[in-house]
Amino acid sequence: MQRIPLKDNRFRIIGYIDIAPNGDKTLRNEKFQILGYYKAKQDVTQDARFMIVGRGDILTSLLRSD
């Protein structure tokens, strides 16, 4: 599994995306709390409660930068 840090315009880490070998992704905030999932096989993005929020990989839209 690969972990990619996400940074804001001040270069602070605001989250992470974990990428599985099959292409599935998990979005986590800076405290490693899960915010959402991308299921590559179904090509859908789900929130932390597994509700579909969109088609395609729109995980970063679930990330809030304060």
Where are the regions a protein language model picked out?
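Intrinsically disordered, low-complexity proline/glycine-rich segments
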Residues: 1-66
